[in-house]
Amino acid sequence: MIKGIQITQAANDSLLNSFWLLDSDKGEARCLAAKSGFAEDQVVAVSELGQFEYRELPLDVQPSVKVEGGQHLNVNVLRRETLEDAVKHPENYPQLTIRVSGYAVRFNSLTPEQQRDVITRTFTESL
């Protein structure tokens, strides 16, 4: 469990009135603010702080989700034949809009190579 503290008495004067996060599960303390002796965000073992008294501070912790990697999905509700016909007859599809990398784009504004790439990526045999 993590709790916030302000040190009110300590043998080490540089700890006085400093603010810390104590992680009782890891036995660590993270310095939030100190006048001297400790850097902001410095992590030390609680035992390194020596004897001290403190007052507990209320914490408002917002859980954060850390996502690394992942997938991206663009949904285009079309038939393959529609896109292939739009390549051959762009004049028949002036308003055909698709999603590419999160952006809406007119299919006819893409280069022929990009159009083929969209068709290939959109219509696959399997995932």
Swiss-Prot record:
Keywords noted in UniProt: Organic radical
CC per GO annotation: cytosol
Domain Glycine radical: 5-127
Residue numbers of Glycine radical PTMs: 102
InterPro entries, A to Z: Auton_GlycylRad_Cofactor, Form_AcTrfase_GR_CS, Gly_radical, Glycyl_radical_cofactor_GrcA
Listed SUPFAM superfamilies: PFL-like glycyl radical enzymes (SSF51998)
One Pfam family per UniProt: Gly_radical
MF-aspect GO terms: formate C-acetyltransferase activity
UniProt function note: Acts as a radical domain for damaged PFL and possibly other radical proteins.
Official protein name in the record: Autonomous glycyl radical cofactor
Species for this entry: Actinobacillus succinogenes (strain ATCC 55618 / DSM 22257 / CCUG 43843 / 130Z)
Gene symbol of the encoding locus: grcA
